[in-house]
């Protein structure tokens, strides 16, 4: 099944802007009209959700069908080194932004709407950091279960996708440190399917499946996209 969507892609930094622009160019070159736009938004800013919605409806009209809550920032500091700034940044981006982005989209979400939260395998595994990142992602999974119940009567589904290690900009920054690189190589080797880390395309395919009409009966679910590393 081939679906055609109009897409608003957000980015934060100049480095991510280049990637966002390349995706937009790829989408728009195959269409007669503009089908993709980019929006600069730092989800630490409390006004970002409304700015994203405003820019989206200005470009494409007042109906929104899908929201993917994908913004994230990782905290690798230990509990003994955890500061209030580290805590707030992680919670603000990974949790608070999901709450208020979803709140902002609801008035424009056309039934049957789809909301996809992106969690992390860290929410289901131990580690050596403070655990704030894992906790913030576990909270996102809890939100999806509650919203699936409260938004279901309006025809909306809410699900969570749980990626494992995935080759993103954040991943590349983390493995730049040799100690982190060794750990990630070990985890990758433990992945049953292929012994590798995931790719953005691996995760996108799962999200794509969840937004299809044939997935309308799936809601409130937490779906592992880890190549079998995390079994839920």
UniProtKB/Swiss-Prot annotation:
Name of the protein: Dehydrogenase OXI1
Gene: OXI1
Catalytic activity: a primary alcohol + NAD(+) = an aldehyde + NADH + H(+); a secondary alcohol + NAD(+) = a ketone + NADH + H(+)
GO molecular function, one term: alcohol dehydrogenase (NAD+) activity
InterPro entries: NAD(P)-bd_dom_sf, Sc_DH/Rdtase_CS, SDR_fam
Family: Belongs to the short-chain dehydrogenases/reductases (SDR) family.
PANTHER family associated with the record: NADPH-DEPENDENT ALDEHYDE REDUCTASE-LIKE PROTEIN, CHLOROPLASTIC-RELATED, RE15974P
The protein's Enzyme Commission number: 1.1.1.1
Organism: Cochliobolus heterostrophus (strain C4 / ATCC 48331 / race T) (Southern corn leaf blight fungus)
Binding residues annotated for NADP(+), in chain numbering: 19, 42, 70, 103, 133, 137, 168
């Amino acid at each position: 099944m081939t679906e055609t969507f109009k897409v608003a892609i957000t980015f934060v930094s100049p480095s991510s802007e280049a990637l966002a622009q390349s995706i937009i160019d790829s989408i728009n070159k195959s269409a007669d009209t503009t089908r993709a736009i980019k929006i600069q938004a730092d989800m630490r800013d409390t006004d970002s959700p409304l700015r994203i919605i405003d820019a989206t409806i200005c470009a494409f009209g007042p109906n929104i069908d899908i929201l993917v809550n994908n913004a994230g920032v990782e905290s690798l500091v230990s509990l003994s080194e955890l500061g209030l700034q580290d805590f707030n940044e992680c919670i603000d981006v990974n949790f608070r932004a999901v709450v208020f982005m979803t709140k902002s989209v609801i008035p424009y979400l056309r039934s049957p709407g789809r909301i996809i939260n992106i969690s992390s395998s860290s929410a289901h595994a131990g580690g050596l950091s403070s655990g704030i990142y894992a906790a913030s992602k576990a909270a996102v999974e809890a939100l999806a279960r509650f919203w699936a119940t409260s938004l279901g009567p309006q025809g909306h589904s809410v699900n969570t996708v749980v990626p494992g290690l995935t080759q993103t900009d954040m991943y590349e920054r983390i493995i730049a440190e040799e100690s982190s690189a060794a750990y990630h190589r070990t985890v990758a080797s433990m992945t049953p399917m292929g012994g590798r880390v995931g790719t953005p395309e691996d995760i996108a395919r799962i999200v794509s499946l969840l937004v299809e009409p044939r997935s309308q009966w799936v809601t409130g679910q937490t779906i592992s996209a880890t190549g079998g590393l995390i079994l839920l």
